[in-house]
């Protein structure tokens, strides 16, 4: 389901632990890492889609997390044409996402990447809050930065800024 502009409605999930580190998932049979995310089905609310995707991709249930906040508006990214399925070319531009910031209230052992028959991730780790901005695939980078900035400024008081984090990184990591 695409909107009139060619964007697929989607939710993104930033899951943090008690140290404000983020869940970073390794895609099945790939060397790429990303936050959990997935499409919103027709008639489904963003929050319902978020809980469904959280279970499908991470194996966590609502009792394992607390919603800290969400982005105010949709954040969009365009997918390069060579990444778009042939049958979608011409109509599909990318994703529009509502991002949720969740705090893990359960334990690390509650994470189950094999909760469904079609896992999205085959590995995961806790990562520094800002590190995914520099590690995610290029076309998602701006949306990751925008989501992390908005959610940290509104809901995580005292969080180091991305600019301060980036200034401390070796120049080869940016």
From Swiss-Prot:
Q: Which Gene3D superfamilies match?
A: Nucleoside Triphosphate Pyrophosphohydrolase
Signal peptide as annotated in the record: none
In which residues does the motif Nudix box occur?
38-59
EC no. given is: 3.6.1.-
Q: Where is the Nudix hydrolase domain?
A: 6-149
Which InterPro entries has this protein been placed in?
Nudix_hydrolase, NUDIX_hydrolase-like_dom_sf, NUDIX_hydrolase_CS, NUDIX_hydrolase_dom, RppH
Matches recorded under Pfam families: NUDIX (PF00293)
Identify which top EC class this enzyme belongs to. Answer: hydrolase
| Organism this protein belongs to | Neisseria gonorrhoeae (strain ATCC 700825 / FA 1090)
Give cofactor(s), names only: a divalent metal cation
Q: What is this protein called?
A: RNA pyrophosphohydrolase
